[in-house]
C-alpha cells in the first residue's frame, strides 16, 4: 500500500530549497505577557529541525 503523508507533520515542517527541514519555534502562541520581550524576539522565525529527527521527519513527509 502507498505511504500517506503525515498531515500533522506536513503542516508544521517546510522543506527549504536546499532540502533542509525548517520548523516554527514553540512558546510563542499565547501567554506572552509573562514572557520577556527578549525571549519573544528570540523565538521569532524558523529553525532547522534537529539532526537526530531529520530522518524520521522526512519519512513522515514521504521524502525519505
Swiss-Prot record:
Pfam family, any one: Ribosomal_L35p
GO MF term list: structural constituent of ribosome
Record-linked PROSITE patterns: RIBOSOMAL_L35
Spans annotated as Disordered: 1-50
Any GO CC annotation of this UniProt entry: cytosolic large ribosomal subunit
Keyword Zinc: no
NCBIfam families: rpmI_bact
PANTHER family for the chain: 54S RIBOSOMAL PROTEIN BL35M (PTHR33343), LARGE RIBOSOMAL SUBUNIT PROTEIN BL35M (PTHR33343:SF1)
The family this protein is said to belong to: Belongs to the bacterial ribosomal protein bL35 family.
Name the record gives this protein: Large ribosomal subunit protein bL35
Amino acid at each position: 500500500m502507498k505511504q500517506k503523508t503525515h498531515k500533522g507533520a506536513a503542516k508544521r515542517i517546510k522543506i527549504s530549497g536546499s532540502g533542509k527541514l525548517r520548523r516554527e519555534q514553540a512558546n510563542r502562541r499565547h501567554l506572552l505577557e509573562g514572557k520577556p520581550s527578549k525571549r519573544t524576539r528570540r523565538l521569532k522565525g524558523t529553525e532547522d529541525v534537529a539532526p537526530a529527527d531529520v530522518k524520521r521527519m522526512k519519512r513522515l513527509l514521504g521524502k525519505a
